[in-house]
Amino acid sequence: MSFINKYVIVVVGPTAAGKTALAVSLAKRFNTAVLSADSRQVFKELSIGTAKATMEEQDGVPHYFVDSISIEESFNAGMFEREGLQLLDTLFLKHDVVIVCGGTGLYVKALLEGMDALPQADPELREALNREFEQRGLEVMTGELKEIDPETHAVIDLKNPLRVFRAIEVYRQTGKPLSSFKTGAKQERPFKTIRIGLNMPREELYARIDRRMDRMLEAGLEKEARDNIQYRNYNALQTVGYSEIFGFIDGLYDREEMIRLLKRNSRRYAKRQLTWFSKDAEVKWFHPGEITEITTFIEAKLQE
């Protein structure tokens, strides 16, 4: 189905940059819906640690890929691409514009440009990597990844074992780094895109990240982690915001150190997000306070 005069407005950027607020504002302006391109917000059980928009923050705007499935179910970028394109087909029947908002770069790329062809996962090799993880720990394995594929090491979530395993797996299968499979070939989409990136001076961003982590802890982040501790080995919980709390629960460090790690790792995650999105030349960057400038830019693009 072709939607040559339909637009996807994409809002990307690092964690705590204000993406959700902008997406809701734009959705209300264009009377449309928001698709969340976030690999963890899709899970019903995870709300505080994923910075999921509350019903109040959603402000009546329909949100998709939020609270969609249980953490016991699997979800990945390929599924997001397939289901997202199907959903856009439906939404474009009544909307000229749809908003996509999120910080998971691979999900955004999959939806807008398609996925790079990669070798299929090898179950035996994956099992071997799991055993190595138990024996060596994640830090040693991320060190190995840095040696064999520094480009991938610079952009993936290093707190996420599945991402690290996959990169090492591809190298061991093929002798080539995962980054070498990224051809840059883009699949044609039947809609146009307007890509907005939010960023600010690093000191300001880091202060926002620290304040938001304080609010998350006040809102019950530790309880959320404890409530889901039976799923701690699931991909979604082996990420920033949860793994640090599990370390505290395990007695590896005290609460003060837990908070320090939560903030430090969130800042590191933001840096990796910026590294990823900065490679997309189509993204037009703004400070989140530049609402008028953002709106003017979008309106001009829609008139082209």
UniProtKB/Swiss-Prot annotation:
Swiss-Prot/TrEMBL catalytic activity: adenosine(37) in tRNA + dimethylallyl diphosphate = N(6)-dimethylallyladenosine(37) in tRNA + diphosphate
EC class: transferase
MF terms (GO), sorted A to Z: ATP binding; tRNA dimethylallyltransferase activity
Keyword tags: ATP-binding, Magnesium, Nucleotide-binding, Transferase, tRNA processing
Cofactor(s) required, per the database record: Mg(2+)
Site (Interaction with substrate tRNA): residue numbering on this chain: 104, 126
Annotated region (Interaction with substrate tRNA), positions in chain: 38-41
Binding site for substrate: 15-20
Positions with a binding annotation for ATP: 13-20
Keyword tRNA processing assigned: yes
Pfam family, one: IPPT
Family label: Belongs to the IPP transferase family.
Job description of the protein: Catalyzes the transfer of a dimethylallyl group onto the adenine at position 37 in tRNAs that read codons beginning with uridine, leading to the formation of N6-(dimethylallyl)adenosine (i(6)A).
Subunit structure: Monomer.
The protein's name: tRNA dimethylallyltransferase
The species this protein was found in: Cytophaga hutchinsonii (strain ATCC 33406 / DSM 1761 / CIP 103989 / NBRC 15051 / NCIMB 9469 / D465)
Lineage: Bacteria, Pseudomonadati, Bacteroidota, Cytophagia, Cytophagales
Gene giving rise to this polypeptide: miaA
